[in-house]
């Protein structure tokens, strides 16, 4: 057995006692939360620890000292009510009484299933509740009839405690909650007729805590602020799925930052990961641009799978995100960014941040020139991988700061050819491979390389919106050179000179005094 297992302790004649916290509907005492608690490993120690905790719970329960623990664990007790059913809730907590939308997925009857057993299963079928019909799409409820659901927001000066879990949920408890709703609003939101209905309550306690509970009501007539002649009342446990609640587990930023509009150019290996992770990070207004379609040869280094082959990458990513990540607005454009800018389908000034994830130096140089020539003050993040994972690079460039993207390039004194000064791969080598002739070349690197670049990007995006960056930056992550050597390619002098795994250069350090775009430090 589990040597760390606590001993279960039950209360005899539990139904004869007053209703008290930390005892479930079968009389078992809830002794400890296992998370963060050190439990004695020997049996006598476990017994003593458990008995002392049981004594404390009962003593505080009889005296009423721990009554407010009901408030801290309201939903836990609600879940133990008889016939409690799961409901998934994705609505805005905007403090308004209103009608929201919902649906119940129909459960098919099994071939040899008795009707009474089928009815029991149907009563446990999950319910899905959203702000509107559009918000229900995340649960694939296309063929499910949509219901109007009453949503009431309650503020109480006194604590509202969960009902006694040893008894069925009563009509009196329901009506006590309905009495908090103004009669006029109640009549307009909840139908008076004797039809099945669902009611959701957002309960605000005096302590500032908020609880979400619901009820499935069969029959009943509304009279003033009470329901009468209810045939059946079933408690609903609300599993919250709204963005505000879900983001509590992951958010590290001010929620206002997530409203920033971000333009991402390129939906390939790096861009695809960046777009998905920006959505997961909570950013809710993304515009993504890419004129290419997803092909089979990209599958093993792209976030999307075979399901999306031969679709435009930007549109496929939108479909994928809308299926999996709630409350993200994505605008797609299957067009070359140069054409989109010239035709004004895209206006850089409309965004708070631009991310270029194409890995195409020539395109990035074009974007950089357009930004600086037009004195656009929207910051730009450029991302690119190097061949065989020898390096990952992220650059932050903002007009008005020293240095620009063009500063990363110089000309060979002997040949006059342009080369990339940031590269960890020695210049003059052929680093591309062919996938079938002219126009089908690519730079070889794996999915892990793109993930590393994506992580550098996300950290930079966070720093930008938290206003932590004062200078233009180039961040370079040095990779292993094993694969490079296996393919008979040589490393650059920069790779040899760099001792650190990550090298950060400011604009003043990487600026090219002969740059014809930023003119050193934008004239400063």
Residue ranges and their predicted role:
Residues 291-327:
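Glycine-rich phosphate-binding loop and adjoining beta1-alpha1-beta2 segment
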Residues 209-262:
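N-terminal charged helix/coil linker that caps or initiates catalytic domains
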Residues 14-70:
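Glycine-centered motif in EGF-like
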Residues 69, 73-222, 349-353, 357-524:
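Glycine-rich phosphate/adenylate-binding loop
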Residues 340-349:
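Short amphipathic alpha-helix with an adjacent loop that forms part of the alpha/beta core around
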Residues 334-337:
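Conserved acidic residues
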Residues 3-4:
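Short, small-residue-biased leader/transition segments that mark boundaries at the very start
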């Amino acid at each position: 057995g589990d040597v760390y297992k606590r001993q279960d302790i039950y209360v005899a004649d539990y139904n004869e006692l007053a209703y008290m916290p930390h005892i479930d509907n079968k009389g078992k005492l809830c002794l400890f939360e296992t998370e963060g608690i050190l439990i004695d490993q020997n049996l006598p120690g476990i017994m003593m620890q458990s008995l002392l905790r049981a004594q404390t719970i009962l003593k505080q329960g009889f005296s009423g000292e721990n009554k407010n623990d009901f408030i801290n664990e309201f939903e836990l007790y609600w879940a133990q009510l008889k016939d409690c059913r799961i409901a998934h809730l994705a609505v805005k907590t905007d403090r308004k009484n209103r009608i929201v939308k919902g649906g119940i997925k129909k459960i098919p009857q099994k071939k040899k299933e008795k009707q009474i057993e089928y009815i029991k299963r149907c009563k446990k079928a999950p319910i899905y509740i959203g702000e509107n019909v559009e918000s229900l799409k995340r649960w694939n409820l296309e063929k499910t009839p949509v219901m109007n659901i009453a949503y009431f927001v309650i503020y109480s000066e006194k604590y509202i405690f969960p009902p006694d879990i040893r008894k069925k949920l009563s009509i009196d408890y329901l009506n006590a909650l309905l009495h908090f709703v103004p009669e006029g609003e109640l009549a307009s939101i909840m139908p008076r007729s004797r039809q099945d209905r669902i009611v959701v309550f957002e309960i605000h306690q005096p302590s500032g805590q908020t609880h979400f509970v619901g009820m499935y009501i069969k029959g009943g007539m509304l009279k003033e602020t009470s329901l009468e002649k209810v045939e059946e009342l079933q408690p609903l446990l609300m599993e919250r799925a709204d963005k505000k609640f879900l983001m509590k587990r992951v958010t590290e930023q001010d929620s206002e930052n997530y409203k920033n509009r971000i333009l991402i150019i390129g939906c390939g290996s790096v861009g695809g990961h960046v777009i998905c992770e920006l959505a997961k990070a909570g950013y809710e207004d993304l515009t993504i641009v890419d004129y290419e379609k997803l092909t089979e040869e990209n599958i093993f280094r792209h976030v999307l799978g075979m399901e999306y082959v031969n679709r435009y990458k930007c549109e496929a990513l939108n479909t994928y995100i809308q299926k999996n990540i709630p409350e993200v607005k994505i605008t797609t454009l299957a067009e070359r960014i140069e054409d989109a800018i010239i035709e004004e389908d895209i206006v850089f000034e409309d965004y708070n941040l631009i991310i270029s994830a194409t890995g195409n130096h020539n395109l990035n140089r074009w974007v950089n020139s357009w930004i600086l020539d037009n004195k656009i003050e929207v910051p730009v993040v450029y991302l690119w991988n190097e061949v065989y994972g020898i390096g990952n690079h992220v650059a932050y460039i903002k007009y008005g700061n020293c240095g620009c993207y063009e500063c990363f390039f110089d000309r060979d004194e002997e040949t006059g050819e342009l080369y990339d000064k940031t590269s960890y791969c020695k210049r003059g080598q052929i680093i591309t491979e062919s996938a079938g002739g002219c126009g089908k070349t690519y730079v070889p690197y794996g999915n892990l390389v793109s993930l590393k670049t994506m992580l550098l990007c996300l950290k930079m995006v966070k720093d930008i919106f938290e206003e932590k960056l004062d200078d233009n930056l180039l961040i370079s992550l040095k990779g292993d050179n094993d694969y490079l050597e296996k393919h008979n390619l040589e490393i650059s002098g920069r790779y040899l000179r760099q001792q650190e795994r990550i090298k950060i250069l400011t604009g003043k350090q990487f600026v090219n005094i002969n740059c014809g775009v930023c003119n050193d430090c934008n004239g400063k």
